[in-house]
Amino acid sequence: MNQEVIAKRYASALFQIALEQGQLDRIEEDVRAVRQALAENGEFLSLLSYPKLSLDQKKALIREAFAGVSTPVQNTLLLLLERHRFGLVPELAGTVSRPRSTTARGIAKAVAYSGAASTDEELRALSDVFAQKVGKQTLEIENIIDPELIGGVNVRIGNRIYDGSVSGQLERIRRQLIG
């Protein structure tokens, strides 16, 4: 089975535990810390794959090295070790990430295309209006300037586009007059 698929399964399970226990921020932070610690200390991974160390010794090393992380993260690390999949930790850490947690918190990403730069107040107003439309608590809006827009704003949320541009309104009027 593909390593990425396996890592996603473990990440998904860890994410569900984080949601159930209300520890999403803590577990996200812990997973990032584990990832960084392993990236900075490559010898640790080599030590865990050393055949002369028993499984209990390796578990003790993990418990000692990651004593400060939450129990679900520590248990996931131990489970990966038992199943000879500890090498998946960096990939697992990449999958327990912002997109999934922002969705769980009711945050969606959006892009607002406008003819000129929008103010923070305008972006906040757009966020409030469109968050309700898509059933989210808030939107993280990125403003992209499109010089072809005469006026108004086009907002893209996921694969949906809301056309509030002047040219879009003129096109709708033209269609009504013709049809």
UniProtKB/Swiss-Prot annotation:
Belongs to the ATPase delta chain family. PANTHER family: ATP SYNTHASE DELTA CHAIN (PTHR11910). InterPro entries: ATP_synth_OSCP/delta_N_sf (IPR026015), ATPase_OSCP/d_CS (IPR020781), ATPase_OSCP/dsu (IPR000711). It is a peripheral membrane protein. GO terms for cellular component: plasma membrane; proton-transporting ATP synthase complex. One of its GO terms (molecular function) is proton-transporting ATP synthase activity, rotational mechanism. It holds the Pfam family OSCP. F(1)F(0) ATP synthase produces ATP from ADP in the presence of a proton or sodium gradient. F-type ATPases consist of two structural domains, F(1) containing the extramembraneous catalytic core and F(0) containing the membrane proton channel, linked together by a central stalk and a peripheral stalk. During catalysis, ATP synthesis in the catalytic domain of F(1) is coupled via a rotary mechanism of the central stalk subunits to proton translocation. This protein is part of the stalk that links CF(0) to CF(1). It either transmits conformational changes from CF(0) to CF(1) or is implicated in proton conduction. This is ATP synthase subunit delta. Its main location: membrane. It is found in: Cell membrane. Keywords: ATP synthesis, Cell membrane, CF(1), Hydrogen ion transport, Ion transport, Membrane, Transport.
